């Protein structure tokens, strides 16, 4: 078993939200998107929520573990793996990135890792006949996917 870094849930979620979509996490948990918001901010809201409990924390850790493991198997490629257990479904690189963007906050990759802007990324997704990702971009995207997966596997959220 790996050694995990314990991080309080109210610190971990904003950090993780930079990399992955919390909407995907709440969908995996079968909760509404506002569930996390109400749990995090219950002291400042008129809500019946009492914040996170042990069951919530356990569920979040399980989801982060599943997402992390699946991201480690996910790779963007001109020759897709066709493995059902990845996030990169689709024949073309833009299709694979679109399916991956349901889980990952793509600005984390194209701004933070590639140093590009939204227009650069959007052009390559919307008009792949004209604009392409080069091999270096694909390699850096795949490294970022691995990094996110490893980070998710290395943390344990706590109360």
Residue ranges and their predicted role:
Residues 68-86, 154-159:
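Short amphipathic recognition helices of helix-turn-helix/homeodomain-type DNA-binding modules
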Residues 29, 40, 61, 113-114, ...:
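A general structural motif at alpha-helix termini
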